[in-house]
Amino acid sequence: MNLKILFVCACLWMAVLVFGSSRNATWGEEPVPAPTPPMGWNSWDAYGESVKESDIRASAEWMAKNLKPFGWEYVVVDSGWYVTNHSAGFNAQNADFSLDAFGRYTPAANTIPSAKEGTGFRPLAEYVHSLGLKFGLHILRGIPKEAVAKRLPIQGSQFHAQDAADTADTCPWNPFNYGLDTAKPAAQAYYDSLARQFADWQVDFVKVDCISSHPYKGDEIRLLSQALKRTGRPIVLSLSPGPAPLDKADEMARYAQMWRISDDQWDVWQSSEAFPQGVNNQLERAAQWAAHSRPGNWPDADMLAIGRLEPAPGWGEPRASRLTRDEQRTLLTLWSIFRSPLIMGGNLQLCDEWTKSLLTNAEVIAVDQHSKGNRAVETTNNSALWLAEPETGAGYYVAVFNRSDEPQTLRYAWKALGLKEQEYSVRDLWEHKELGSAAELRVTLRAHGSVLYAIRPFLNP
């Protein structure tokens, strides 16, 4: 071979190696799922179990037009998509289901009409993909009780549903399924068949419920994770509900990309009788979990209960979010400095300009998507202080929270944040405004208010 050709080939190969080394994965390695916190919309907070295909399509269209340029991409259908008689009520004992011949839930054709020909969610997923977005769904861990009662075969195996089921294990707040007996090969076979179904439907995101708390089911997490990986399709695995046990953080990180750190987060400032979770209460939980955030692993503070929670929210009456505007900014500020997944819960079709402004602030989103070293510096009963750094470039991100029911002025020396004592230039990321230089951090906040700043060492001209 001509030496010149050999030289050119060698140069090209070196370029490939250098380029490959700069990516999330190198040759021979799998790409990291969810390298940044997932961003999207989930149907639960607005529609509960009543969501219809027309709602999903319209929400996806709105997201593609208004939110996609800012990084929002997942459209997730939450609980109940396989229930054919929603009038029976939430998690009703007399619910009727749509099942295939292998004991797997399929979309109810009366609410997801594109599934009528046995195509499942594939037509809807393809439509969502055509908009440049990704498609997700919610499942309950385990196997349908109806599949066990009918002794249905498990696709791709010699087993039947009763071989996989642990009939002594039912989710304490949803009676639809039995848990799986993870000591039996049939359990893995069932989750394998479920994962193949999802891959065939072109699913990109699976939220699995009753698995990370109430109770924690580590073996089922492992089996489902293995099943999804075997499909060869990159599918984000999101674990619910919370609070996930902190001592299981490393185990969850091996098998999932997201896990809930609290009970359901709704539009309340303070928890009442432990449910739902209040925004204020997330400050302690986020502080505990911050060290466990990394590419592919994101402790999840739950959905953003902002905007219009209607027509049939999963908790409470139809309403506008009860969080004040200050509390809504505080929610987004905490979620971003903590690097939680950002999953909008409100009705996108009814999204007002204020809510849209919260979801399309590129400077705030950049903190969530591209920061490092995120940590709580101080958490007291009346305030909280967080610090992070941009992934690239100089400076820091600083968030200050007023947890008090009264306005207050908070002052911190820069050394209290572990920073060098000097002047820093300060930019307000919510207001897109330069605030000048400061020899200390001093903020005056309304009740439940917050600020999110970018700071850099001040250089005199």
Put a short name on every predicted segment:
Residues 163-169, 182-183, 189, 193, ...:
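Glycan-recognition surfaces
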